[in-house]
Amino acid sequence: MSTVIATYLLHDEKDIRKKAEGIALGLTVGTWTDLPALEQEQLRKHKGEVVGIEELGESGPANEYFDKRLKRAIVKIAYPTVNFSADLPALLATTFGKLSLDGEVRLLDLELSDEWKRHFPGPRFGIAGIREKVGVYDRPLLMSIFKGIIGRDLAYLTSELKKQALGGVDLVKDDEILFDNELLPFEKRITAGKAALQEVYEQTGKRTLYAVNLTGKTFELKEKAKRAAELGADVLLFNVFTYGLDVLQGLREDENINVPIMAHPAFSGAMTPSEFYGVAPSLLLGKFLRLAGADFVLFPSPYGSVALEREQALGIARALTDEQEPFARAFPVPSAGIHPGLVPLLVRDFGLDCIVNAGGGIHGHPDGAIGGGQAFRAAIDAALAGRLLREAVKENEALQKAIDRWGAIEVEA
């Protein structure tokens, strides 16, 4: 029998096993011991089962926080897939719908059978496809966030796009809070942006992609995305958690939207930060987004301005790139507060197949966006060569200025 196995972290004053059994029954057949034998036999294939309990013992900080003694355990429950349709909304409603309202319960993971995974598309392009588009195979990619664009016009956008591209970035993304407006209409951002980046390409031979923010009412998104594809959009930035995972999957599965999708984590912080409630970041920002079809996934880095714990951030990256999964690997994009002095940490922790993503770390450089991009490229080259930044700055003025402004964290070989 095909099942989905959900892993939870439970905190409860009472019997953890009893709590787990109540969840397994309550989210499937509702009751069991009071049913006649014939009905039990008929419903057996629909019944949830507790398949594992690992008791963790009490947590002093948790007891102090809740002002009561709580037992803790990792609990695994198997849900028969015959109970729900093969889509993410049904999966979430079953495994963590009303349960998310029921005390101190946190969803850590969902294990899907190979049969069930076939219902999901995964990334259309993934790491390999994106690398082919930019022609870069031997280093982390560099992306610039288009900051300070709200209230500006197309002339400003194209001018700043060129500067960022001339600095050597591989991608430029819209700010996630840049929406369709009279000064910067969606379609004109695409056409003007492509023209500007083509000019730089003809000048330098270096290809830069532009991720335009796909926004608007949910039921208008597909037509808008199709139009973007027709206009030659490089990448679509998408605030997936303000719309829903199934909307992302719908965009990915439409064959007329043959454009990479970059998932932004905006609003996910409402679901992930607590150790007692919500959804683990590796599941929400990792496994789910890869299943649904994101080619890139932004998430807070462990050392920036909106930091995740290091192991949580690495867990997201592992979920996006695990080669045991039957999907293309998605690009991890650790973000927020990144500057050139952090590049050695990024390379150490996330390796070659990640994207170094910066806003203020590029635009705030003393020499502007061009200098900011150059500083990052020099830092990436130094990290890959195993050189300390304090040595690399001797050969690169842009990197020296960046380190003078933001400092650096060296990673000794």
From Swiss-Prot:
Its cofactor is Mg(2+). Keywords: Amino-acid biosynthesis, Isomerase, Magnesium, Metal-binding, Methionine biosynthesis. Pathway: Amino-acid biosynthesis; L-methionine biosynthesis via salvage pathway; L-methionine from S-methyl-5-thio-alpha-D-ribose 1-phosphate: step 3/6. It is an enzyme of class 5 (isomerase). GO terms for biological process: carbon fixation; L-methionine salvage from methylthioadenosine. Gene3D superfamilies: Ribulose bisphosphate carboxylase, large subunit, C-terminal domain (3.20.20.110), RuBisCO large subunit, N-terminal domain (3.30.70.150). The keyword DNA damage does not apply. It catalyses: 5-methylsulfanyl-2,3-dioxopentyl phosphate = 2-hydroxy-5-methylsulfanyl-3-oxopent-1-enyl phosphate. The modification N6-carboxylysine is found at residue 173. Its EC number is 5.3.2.5. Mg(2+) binds at residues 173, 175-176. The active site is at residue 98. Binds 1 Mg(2+) ion per subunit. Belongs to the RuBisCO large chain family. Type IV subfamily. Catalyzes the enolization of 2,3-diketo-5-methylthiopentyl-1-phosphate (DK-MTP-1-P) into 2-hydroxy-3-keto-5-methylthiopentenyl-1-phosphate (HK-MTPenyl-1-P). Homodimer. This is 2,3-diketo-5-methylthiopentyl-1-phosphate enolase. It comes from Geobacillus thermodenitrificans (strain NG80-2). The gene is mtnW.
